[in-house]
Amino acid sequence: MATEKEIVVSGIRPTGYLHLGNYFGAIRNYIRMQEEFNCYFFVADWHSLTTHPNPKDLQANVMRVLAENIASGLDPEKVTLYAQSHVPEIAELYLLMNMLAYKGELERVPTFKDKVRLQPENVNAGLLTYPVLMSVDILIQRAVKVPVGKDQGQHLEMARNFAQRFNERYGNLFPEPEAFNYGDNLVRILSLDGKGGKMSKSENEMATIYLSDSDEQIRQKLRKAKTDSGGVPGEPMPESVANLIEIMKLVSTPDTVQFYVDAFNAGSIRYGDMKTQLGEDMVKFISPIREKAAALQADPTYLRKIMKEGAEKARVNAAQTLQQARNLIGLNYY
Ligand code: TYM
């Protein structure tokens, strides 16, 4: 029965085009999890408001993220897909949870410190309390597993802290959620420029492969990917090459990967060949997703229907948790 399955929650901010990091850090897990778990996947539109997007861009981005999730293999019949802002219960629990979140701990969050450094002119309260909202997204559905990339690990730790803090003060309500990946470790896909940063929606477009890239863009970006000057037998693999091998493992056959790993170890690797091969395998992987996503975006009526039905389901489960939270806190006067 659906209610007996473990609950899973994850979200993606609609702040730009989805890329390989989003796919391999998160969406790939969603697709497998939909068969085994009771999954709630949402577009984190409130979270994206910290950067004040213009309303038209916001709407286009929300619809695209939804379309790209479905095009990647999420089945709206199996999972609950919704926009965060369509579940107002989240906002109330966020208000309640903010009373248990301390300024000091929020200021110490690495993602907050990064934002303060990158956008000192826009350090708003939403940014500071971002991890509280994210925790509530998860806790309100009483999720136990949260498929995310490595960059979200710290936020998950905070979600566990908030769950514990609430449970200790008011009584047991929230399970403690864990970050989840089918492999051993959480995934971090690096950008192709070899500078060590992660692929991200809004930075360095030439070093990021998007699910919406054309075949030619994919080939071109991979041709330009950073490698090194050539393997020397016995030398450790540079990070930029290791990242390409990791990406190759995701889209190429095991034999192809092994061939290039062996060539690296033997000092005979030809990076041009490797990048051409990876380009072709990547095109095969991305082009069906891109085409399906385009077709879905041409049918906004369908996407709206999915979102609406998803929000209705997500609200039922969220409302139950919220009511229990109100009761435990003592906000039940009649
Ligand atoms: P966001 O929108 O930045 O990213 C969506 C998902 O993609 C993963 N990801 C990556 N994984 C590996 N390598 C990369 N280069 C890479 N870049 C992104 C992210 O880890 C994430 O899983 N705060 C979240 C959104 C959110 C959320 C939630 C997630 C809001 N509420 C509740 C889970 C549960 C974020 O900004 O993700």
Predicted region positions:
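Short helix-capping/linker segments at secondary-structure and domain boundaries
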Residues: K103-E107, I140-P147, S252-Y260, R290
